[in-house]
A protein has these predicted regions:
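Conserved GNAT-fold acetyl-CoA-binding loop/helix
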Residues: 21-44
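Conserved acetyl-CoA-binding loop-helix of GNAT-fold acetyltransferases
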Residues: 81, 87-100, 123, 127
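A conserved beta-turn-beta hairpin within the catalytic core of GNAT-like acetyltransferases
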Residues: 68-77, 86, 108, 136-139
Length: 148
């Protein structure tokens, strides 16, 4: 199975927002309360469009990945695998692509954060070797060394 990361097009914001809402609504709503207007503005103002990629496997869209380069690392803002494709080890394969890209670019780490209440995501990232580097009541920051 061939994984492709295809950068989103400028006219795809509504689709991206729909996927982000589907993937994060329950966690954001439980912690902060969900507000569509706030979340739209946040995505438009705090994230660069070129950080977002559709995830394709065998030419079928299976999810959305948002990550950015910084310092000597990549930071994964979100990985959403569509519900019908979950529990098929696709998330791990996508993260392996990110890890390999980081190594190819000479980056030593991949970092991310997760809601503390998102237990399945935390189990997933820890199973890939991610270690908690910071925590507070609602979030954990995690990091994986991918190169020395």
């Amino acid at each position: 199975m061939d994984i492709q990361l295809i950068q989103i097009e400028n006219d795809e914001f509504e689709s991206v927002f729909s996927v982000v809402k589907q993937g994060l609504y329950s966690h954001v709503d439980a912690v902060f309360g969900w507000c569509d207007e706030f979340q739209v503005n946040r995505l438009k103002n705090d994230y660069e469009p070129h950080w977002f990629h559709w995830v394709y496997i065998n030419n079928e869209q299976v999810g959305l990945l948002c990550f950015k380069p910084y310092e000597n690392a990549f930071h994964v803002h979100l990985l959403i695998v569509f519900p019908e494709f979950q529990n098929q080890q696709l998330g791990g394969r996508v993260m392996n692509v990110v890890h390999e890209m980081a190594r190819e670019q000479g980056r030593s780490h991949v970092t991310l954060s997760s809601f503390t209440r998102n237990e399945s995501a935390l189990r997933f990232y820890k199973s890939l070797g991610y270690k908690v580097t910071e925590s507070d009541e609602n979030f954990l920051s995690l990091s994986l060394q991918v190169a020395s």
